[in-house]
């Protein structure tokens, strides 16, 4: 069986990595070895940060809900407990959107939570 030299395959594979490394600084977009290393690191960061993004958005929503709830004389934890008691099923994303874009609707939700807590 004759020996097959992998020139075209190797070139294609390296070209693919260098294309992924486009926009990197210094040798990291020019040299295969450093580009390959950086692309692997970038993949690791992307994997980690896709999960981090979910945590970050949840933190942002909670901060917005807390700020709006405190403007209505209620803490975040009291509001969430009140909503649970009142059986109002709204997720944090929806509540944060109400707090930012429709203050009157958010105030009515807070009043419903207060009423449920005072029963």
Swiss-Prot record:
GO terms for biological process: ribosomal large subunit assembly; translation. Pfam families: Ribosomal_L20 (PF00453). The keyword Metal-binding does not apply. The keyword Cell membrane does not apply. Binds directly to 23S ribosomal RNA and is necessary for the in vitro assembly process of the 50S ribosomal subunit. It is not involved in the protein synthesizing functions of that subunit. HAMAP family: Ribosomal_bL20. Belongs to the bacterial ribosomal protein bL20 family. This is Large ribosomal subunit protein bL20. The lineage of its organism: Bacteria, Bacillati, Bacillota, Bacilli, Lactobacillales.
């Amino acid at each position: 069986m004759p020996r097959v030299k992998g020139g075209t395959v190797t070139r294609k594979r390296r070209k693919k990595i260098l294309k992924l490394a486009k926009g990197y600084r210094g040798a990291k977009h020019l040299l295969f070895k450093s580009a390959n290393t950086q692309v692997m690191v970038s993949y690791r960061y992307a994997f980690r940060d896709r999960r981090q993004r979910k945590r970050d958005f949840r933190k942002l929503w909670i901060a917005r809900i807390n700020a709006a709830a405190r403007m209505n004389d209620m803490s975040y934890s009291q509001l969430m407990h009140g909503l649970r008691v009142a059986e109002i099923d709204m997720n944090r994303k929806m509540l944060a959107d109400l707090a930012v874009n429709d203050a009157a609707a958010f105030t009515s939700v807070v009043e419903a939570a207060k009423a449920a807590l005072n029963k």
